[in-house]
Amino acid sequence: MSSNSDHHISVEHTDGVATIRFTRPSKHNAASGQLLLETLEALYRLESDDSVGAIVLTGEGAVFSAGFDLEEVPMGPASEIQSHFRLKALYYHAVIHMLARIEKPTLAAINGPAVGGGLGMSLACDLAVCTDRATFLPAWMSIGIANDASSSFYLPRIVGYRRAMEWLLTNRTLGADEAYEWGVVNRVFSEADFQSRVGEIARQLAAAPTHLQGLVKNRIQEGSSETLESCTEHEVQNVIASVGHPHFAERLAMFRSKEMRSSALAVDLDAVCGGR
C-alpha cells in the first residue's frame, strides 16, 4: 500500500514481517475513520498472507497515535455527535477485535506519545516496546468522554486493578520507564536503537510457527476467565491438535536424529535435565 496523501496508513513487508504504519504525522497520527478502516482492511489481508509471520503497528514521525481525530467531530446537535462517536467506536473495536483474533503475533512499536485510543490500540497488541522518549496518557478525562478502545478490558489485566483505576482517574502521563515498570511495555529502547531492535524482535516472532502462536494467544486470552479444570482441558485439546500438525512430525524427526542430538539445543536440554 502506498503512503501517499490518499492513504492514512502504509503497509511494508520485510523478512516475513508486515509493518502497519500510521501516516498522519501532521495530525499526530490521530485515528480518522479512514485510518481505522484501512488498518482493519490491512489486518484482514495479512491474516491470510502466508508470507507474513508477524505484524508491527507503529507511527510515522514523533508520535505513535493521538487517538480519536476530534477534527472529524461534526458541528451538529448532540444526537449527530453521538452517532459519529458510535460509528468511530465500532471502527476502533473492529480493529481491536481483529488484533485479538488474528493468529499472528502483533507488536506495538511505540515511537512516541500513545494517547487515548492510541494507547488502547497499543494495549490490544500481544507485545509492546517503546522508545525512551515515549509517553502514555489516557486523555479521556481531558476531552470529556468516557474511556474506550478496550482500555476497560486490557488495562486491569495488564497493570492490575489499582493501577488501572489510578491511571484512568488521575489521567496522569506515564513515561517510558514507569510504563515498563507497570507492564504497559515489554522493553524500552533508546531512540537510536529503536528501529533495529524492533526489527530483531519482529523477525524472531515471524520465524516461529504461526499455528502454535495462535494456540498460545487463544489460551492466554481465554484462560484468565476460565476455571482451572476448563483451562487445562483446553490445553490438552491444543496439545492434541498441535501434535497432529506436520510441523511437530518434522521437529520430532529432527529430535530423534543424530544431527539434532549433537546440536546446541540438545546439549542445552541435557544440561538442564541432567542428561549425558
Curated annotation (Swiss-Prot):
Substrate binds at A66, G67, F68, D69, L70, E71, G117, R261. It comes from the Bacteria. PROSITE patterns: ENOYL_COA_HYDRATASE. It catalyses: 4-chlorobenzoyl-CoA + H2O = 4-hydroxybenzoyl-CoA + chloride + H(+). Coiled coil: none annotated. It is an enzyme of class 3 (hydrolase). Pathway: Xenobiotic degradation; 4-chlorobenzoate degradation; 4-hydroxybenzoate from 4-chlorobenzoate: step 2/3. The active site is at H93, D148. Dehalogenates 4-chlorobenzoyl-CoA, 4-iodobenzoyl-CoA, 4-bromobenzoyl-CoA and, at a slower rate, 4-fluorobenzoyl-CoA. Does not dehalogenate 2-chlorobenzoyl-CoA or 3-chlorobenzoyl-CoA. Gene3D superfamilies: 2-enoyl-CoA Hydratase, Chain A, domain 1, Lyase 2-enoyl-coa Hydratase, Chain A, domain 2. Optimum temperature is 45 degrees Celsius. Activity is lost after 5 minutes incubation at 60 degrees Celsius, but one-fifth of this activity is restored after cooling to 45 degrees Celsius. Keywords: Hydrolase. It comes from Arthrobacter sp. Its EC number is 3.8.1.7. Belongs to the enoyl-CoA hydratase/isomerase family. Homotetramer. GO terms for molecular function: 4-chlorobenzoyl-CoA dehalogenase activity. Pfam families: ECH_1. This is 4-chlorobenzoyl coenzyme A dehalogenase-1. InterPro entries: ClpP/crotonase-like_dom_sf, ECH/Chromodomain_protein, Enoyl-CoA_hyd/isom_CS, Enoyl-CoA_hydra/iso, Enoyl-CoA_hydra_C. Optimum pH is 8.0 in MOPS buffer at 30 degrees Celsius, 7.5 in 0.1 M potassium phosphate buffer at 30 degrees Celsius, and 7.4 in 20 mM potassium phosphate/2 mM DTT buffer at 30 degrees Celsius. Retains full activity in MOPS buffer between pH 6.5 and 10.0. Is irreversibly damaged below pH 6.5 in MOPS buffer, enzyme treated at pH 6.0 in MOPS buffer only regains 40% of its original activity after re-equilibration at pH 7.2. When treated at pH 5.2 or 10.1 in 20 mM potassium phosphate/2 mM DTT buffer activity is lost completely, but is recovered within 17 minutes following readjustment to pH 7.4.
